[in-house]
Amino acid sequence: MKSFYHYLMKYRHPKPQDAISQFANQAYEDHGFPKTSSDYHELSSYLELSADYLETMATFDEAWEKYETEVHHA
């Protein structure tokens, strides 16, 4: 199964137009991001405790929903 990070990288963009693209760009620059994880709670905890670049967890939740739909139910 594709990790959340690997999935998120498809949203990277040099000129991000939305919050998920900004999140993807920032996660790419975050060397501590749990790149192999597919666990919601692990990722959520990391972002809440260690990532100061995410303005709202709603962005993560939206990206997670897309990940769940496209990867887990594909």
From Swiss-Prot:
UniProt similarity note: Belongs to the UPF0346 family.
Lineage summary: Bacteria, Bacillati, Bacillota, Bacilli, Bacillales
Protein name as it appears in the record: UPF0346 protein RBAM_019500
Organism of origin: Bacillus velezensis (strain DSM 23117 / BGSC 10A6 / LMG 26770 / FZB42)
Superkingdom of this protein's organism: Bacteria
